[in-house]
């Protein structure tokens, strides 16, 4: 039917949620409008909603691990501010996102911190699936309330120094070396942070949102985005 109508379409992988079982496929006409954002490859048959699409990590760094260094970063809270102040690329920073995750029983919850490279964007669907909870069970945490329990400090949170908190680490960070991360202390960051030596994640998985131009997870060609 799609072909007879002259439509450009793909069989698209879609996410079914943490409780939904296996991945689903749906036929979508590619256009500039539509309910879903779709990542697709013109060099192979890969097509998936951006919520579902796997992200190809950068190659592991071959740098030697440098000594951990605590540095003053007065008032520098965003990735852009920190990167500019320390004169490093955003890809050499670690971004922290803080969440409150509700349990099955009323009033039950835990805190979680997700960490991705500073130049990447968090894919909320991947995070929710990694936590194994319904979508409505996850919300951004109040920084002050979470800080009182876990040691997180708004704008200066990193994976080192947190406690009573589930740490979810994007898989790409495990192969990157000498990154900048918050020191869990106001106005301070750490330089030369390395996974394994300085911190570990309770969950390590792909947390990244795919963008136009990123590598196709099947063939490696640049992906494109459309609606459908």
Predicted regions and their residues:
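Extended, low-hydrophobicity, polar/charged segments
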Residues: 1-228
């Amino acid at each position: 039917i799609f072909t007879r109508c002259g439509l450009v379409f793909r069989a698209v992988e879609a996410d079914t949620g943490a409780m939904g079982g296996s991945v689903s496929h749906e036929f979508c006409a590619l256009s500039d409008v539509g309910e879903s954002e779709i990542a697709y490859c013109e060099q192979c048959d890969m097509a998936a909603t951006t919520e579902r699409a796997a992200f190809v990590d950068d190659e592991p760094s071959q740098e030697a691990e440098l000594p951990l260094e605590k540095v003053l970063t007065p008032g520098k809270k965003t990735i852009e501010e920190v990167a500019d102040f320390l004169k490093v690329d955003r890809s050499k920073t670690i971004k922290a996102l803080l969440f409150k995750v509700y349990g099955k029983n009323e009033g039950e919850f835990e805190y979680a911190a997700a960490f991705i490279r500073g130049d990447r964007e968090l894919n909320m669907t991947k995070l929710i699936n990694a936590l194994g909870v319904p979508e409505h069970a996850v919300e951004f945490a109040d920084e002050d309330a979470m800080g009182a329990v876990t040691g997180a400090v708004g704008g200066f949170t990193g994976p080192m120094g947190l406690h009573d908190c589930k740490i979810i680490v994007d898989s790409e960070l495990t192969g990157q070396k000498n990154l900048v991360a918050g020191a869990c202390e106001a106005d301070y960051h750490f330089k030369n942070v390395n996974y394994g030596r300085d911190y570990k994640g309770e969950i390590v998985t792909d947390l990244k949102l795919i963008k136009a131009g990123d590598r196709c997870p099947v063939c490696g060609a640049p992906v494109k985005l459309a609606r459908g």
